[in-house]
């Protein structure tokens, strides 16, 4: 099968960005993709770089809502499993950074909410987001069993481990990682490769690209295989539709050769063992 990471730069307004994203879905399908993942908040200005501005709460929408429903229609049209990311309004005063997961028939399978919320220069997220409460769902899709790690979640190995133990074959990572985060950029691929090989899963990272306000998103989206190797990598700073061919049977082959999960004593790692 093939998966696509949409290394995307928003167009200055949501309507134009959504039009472009839908066109990219058609391109991905034309390239043979079965799954496409878009970056974090790809269709809007990355507002968390602005500290404590209540106006941005007006940008949030429910799930399902207008953005999700538009992607549901496109997913059904192109028979393409689709993972996006939106600013979710779940209830009055309750907002999340969320990734709806849409199957190839257009059905909304659910949404994963970012569990770990950052607070650092350029990423003033605690003002805007509640900590996610969805846990680690694994979605049964036509492209396989998919889990989601949104941006900051990727820094926590426990997140990938929970998804792998839940049966995930592919973990997708919608992110908005910029050049201002030098410490994160230094480990950009290494930490994901480590999680891929430790759990013997595929990981697909979709980053934003280009200048957005004060942040320069550097792109370099990539796909890591169950043996930890990077098998596809996008350009730096520029938009690109990265399409990678993967074989989910590689998971079985790697786990037979080195059965990390079989030998894991997770019964020893409960909260009462800390």
List each model region and its residues.
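Short, acidic/polar
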Residues: 16-27, 156-161
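A short C-terminal boundary segment appended to hydrolase-like catalytic domains
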Residues: 249-274
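Cys-nucleophile CN-hydrolase/nitrilase-fold catalytic domain and related Cys-dependent amidase chemistry
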Residues: 14, 25-105, 177-194, 198-201
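CN hydrolase (nitrilase-like) catalytic-core segments centered on the catalytic cysteine
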Residues: 63-83, 145, 154-241
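Active-site catalytic loop in hydrolytic enzyme cores
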Residues: 73, 90-166, 179-194, 257-260
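Short beta-strand scaffold segments in enzyme catalytic cores
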Residues: 84-86, 98-101, 137, 221-223, ...
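Short beta->alpha transition motifs characteristic of CBS
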Residues: 48, 100, 111-118, 222, ...
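Active-site-proximal beta-strand elements of phosphoester/diester hydrolases
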Residues: 1-12, 17, 37, 98, ...
């Amino acid at each position: 099968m093939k998966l696509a990471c949409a290394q995307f730069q928003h167009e200055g307004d949501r309507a134009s960005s959504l039009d472009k994203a839908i066109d990219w879905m058609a391109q991905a399908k034309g390239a043979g993709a079965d799954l496409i993942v878009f970056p974090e908040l790809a269709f809007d200005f990355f507002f968390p770089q602005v500290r404590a501005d209540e106006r941005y709460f007006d940008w949030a929408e429910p799930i399902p809502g207008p953005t999700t429903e538009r992607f549901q229609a496109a997913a059904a049209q192109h028979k393409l499993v689709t993972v996006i990311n939106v600013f979710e309004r779940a209830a009055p005063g309750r907002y999340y950074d969320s990734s709806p997961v849409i199957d190839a028939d257009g059905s909304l399978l659910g949404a994963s909410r970012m569990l770990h919320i950052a607070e650092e220069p350029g990423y003033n997220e605690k003002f805007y987001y509640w900590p996610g409460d969805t846990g680690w769902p694994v979605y049964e899709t036509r492209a396989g069993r998919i889990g989601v790690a949104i941006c900051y979640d990727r820094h926590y190995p426990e997140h990938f481990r929970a998804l792998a133990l839940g049966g995930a074959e592919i973990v997708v990572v919608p992110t908005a990682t910029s050049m201002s985060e030098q410490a994160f950029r230094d480990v950009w691929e290494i930490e994901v490769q480590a999680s891929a090989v430790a759990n013997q899963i595929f990981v697909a990272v979709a980053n934003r690209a280009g200048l957005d306000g004060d942040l320069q998103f550097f792109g370099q989206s990539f796909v890591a295989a169950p043996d930890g190797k990077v098998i596809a990598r996008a350009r730096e700073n520029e938009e690109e539709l990265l399409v990678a061919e993967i074989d989910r049977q590689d998971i079985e082959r790697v786990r037979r050769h080195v059965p990390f999960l079989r030998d894991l004593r997770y019964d020893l790692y409960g909260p009462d063992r800390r």
